[in-house]
A protein has these predicted regions:
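Intrinsically disordered, low-complexity terminal regions
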Residues: 1-282
Length: 282
């Protein structure tokens, strides 16, 4: 399913395309899929009636190379609730409050402004170039990839998947269970609860960082000039000796200041290791 802004300010346009087959076979594909479109008030449904699953149908499924695409053209500014049980969602250039709920369906969103809530399962989710009030992604067994997002709040929740977020300007909230997390260039505070989810942080956070982990190692890679009030707890704790630090060092606890201090950098991993190492820069 491809979702794009349309020219009409009060209508949704639905188009169906058949690719990777001869033109003469396209009608046969539509007949077998029994595709129909229906609108009830503000709800547009594109669905297939249950096909006759006889021997010829399954033979056709095995041998057919046809691909079906559904294009939705939304009004330039609109609120939409998009649900699909399968396929793929590709949304680009839309504005409004958007909700996407999909299982076993890759989701790719780019150049969206407004708010975006995604619930996904089992397939990749990517959101690039977002600008709005809220970005909320909740997934199971999925990879989450967020890049270049400006928002008041970004919430990322994953179970048995992965999270990668870079170039984010927002308050970032993380909830990860069995999901490795990689963060880079976060302009905003970071709050996270991690369970069996290793986390790696690159760059210099501009606001406080508060991370709590159970059974997960955490590594923060910071520039030598980075200033913060730090509190690190883990088994063990490693603070790069090349970083300028004043305070108390113990095998399982470090409290003090990096350079002249600054926002809070609080990392706790029980059980788990905590490493604060020198990254790039001078």
């Amino acid at each position: 399913m491809r979702i794009r802004p349309g020219e009409s300010h009060d209508r949704v346009a639905v188009s169906v395309y058949i690719d990777n087959c001869d033109p003469d076979d396209a009608k046969d594909v539509l007949d077998r899929m029994r595709l129909s479109t229906r609108q009830v008030k503000n709800t547009v449904r594109v669905h297939t009636d249950e096909p006759v699953r006889d021997t010829s149908y399954w033979k056709w499924v095995r041998e057919s190379t046809a691909q079906l695409y559904i294009d939705l053209k939304l009004p330039p500014k609109t609120d939409a609730d998009i649900r699909t049980p399968a396929g793929e969602i590709d949304a680009d250039g839309i504005q409004g409050a958007i909700v996407i709920d999909a299982a076993a369906c890759p989701i790719h969103v780019s150049n969206l402004s407004g708010s975006l809530k995604i619930t996904a399962q089992g397939e990749p989710v990517s959101v690039h170039d977002f600008d709005g009030d809220l970005l909320d992604i909740r997934s199971t067994a999925s990879t989450i990839d967020v890049a270049r997002a400006v928002s008041s709040v970004v919430n990322l929740s994953s179970a048995a998947g992965t999270i990668e977020a870079r170039s984010i300007q927002a308050v970032l909230n993380l909830d990860a269970h069995g999901s490795p997390v990689t963060l880079a260039d976060i302009d905003g505070s970071i709050h996270g609860d991690l369970n069996a989810s290793p986390l790696t942080l690159h760059g210099v956070p501009s606001s406080e960082v508060n991370l709590n982990a159970v059974g997960s190692p955490i590594e923060a890679s910071v520039e030598p000039s980075f200033g913060a009030d730090v509190q690190l707890e883990g088994r063990p704790v490693e603070l790069d000796p090349s970083l300028t630090f004043r305070g108390e060092r113990e095998p399982e606890r470090v409290i003090g200041r990096l350079n002249n201090g600054g926002s809070g950098l609080k990392i706790r991993a029980v059980p788990g290791s905590v490493r604060c190492v020198r990254g790039g820069g001078v």
